[in-house]
């Protein structure tokens, strides 16, 4: 990439004022080598995506625990019925209510008629959204989820607060103050995934904060990349690369 970019007149390369990119070290090296006067801005959506993934990790961990708990309780219920049958006694549940010998185990349901495993599974997408975009059903589900799992609420709060930091229009200095508060909250939470994200952001903080200068993102490049991939998939492969590039320039340039 550097070799091909160097074919462009150095005066033109020097006119580039800003480049947005992700956390890729290779892309960082390319920009440093080819665009000496460009300000590097790390795309805000990439570190926000890392936070969303960290929230999902917390949710999935709780769901796995719940699935294990339900499986254990189902087995205990089966063994209890078997024990009553062997003794020739009428089975009863923990509250003393009569139970059939062939009864199936049903996990406890919450007030929205979902089990804990179900609410953990169905909360995936609401945890990726801003609360102001939730439907009434999602609002009710979120309230129950956060009440039952405060750790998920804290993880979501950290992810959402980072989104809000980059949604505000402020100076680079004020953005830095907000980020420092966010680092502190992450440290108090003590989750490894969030700690890793905060450490990576702290290491590249100046380039992340450059977003507040022009509010530039990678959105246009990501959109074009998606269109090119879709176009390539429709062709079911490329035989003549030069002709493919010619078609791309005619369609998208």
Enumerate the predicted regions with their spans:
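Short, surface-exposed amphipathic charged segments that create phosphate/polyanion-binding patches used
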Residues: 52-64
């Amino acid at each position: 990439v550097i070799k091909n970019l160097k074919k462009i007149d150095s005066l033109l390369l020097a006119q580039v004022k800003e480049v947005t990119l992700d956390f890729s070290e290779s892309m960082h090296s390319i920009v440093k080598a080819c665009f000496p006067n460009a300000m590097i801005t790390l795309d805000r959506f990439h570190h926000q995506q890392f936070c969303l993934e960290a929230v999902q990790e917390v949710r999935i961990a709780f769901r796995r625990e719940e699935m294990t708990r339900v499986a254990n309780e189902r087995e205990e219920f089966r063994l209890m019925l078997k024990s009553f049958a062997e003794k020739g006694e009428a089975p009863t549940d923990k509250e003393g209510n009569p139970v059939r010998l062939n009864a199936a185990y049903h996990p406890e349901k919450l007030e929205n008629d979902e089990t804990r495993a179900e609410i953990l599974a169905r909360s995936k997408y609401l945890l990726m959204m801003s609360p102001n975009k939730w439907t009434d059903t999602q609002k009710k589900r979120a309230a129950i989820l956060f009440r039952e799992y405060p750790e998920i609420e804290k993880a979501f709060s950290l992810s959402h607060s980072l989104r809000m930091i980059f949604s505000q229009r402020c100076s680079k200095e004020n953005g830095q103050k907000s980020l420092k508060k966010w680092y502190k909250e992450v440290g108090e939470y003590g989750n490894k995934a969030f700690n890793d994200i905060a450490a990576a952001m702290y290491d590249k903080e100046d380039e992340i904060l450059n977003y507040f200068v022009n509010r530039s993102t990678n959105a246009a490049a990501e959109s074009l990349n998606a269109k090119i991939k879709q176009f390539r998939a429709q062709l079911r492969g490329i035989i003549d690369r030069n002709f493919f590039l010619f078609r791309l320039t005619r369609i998208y340039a």
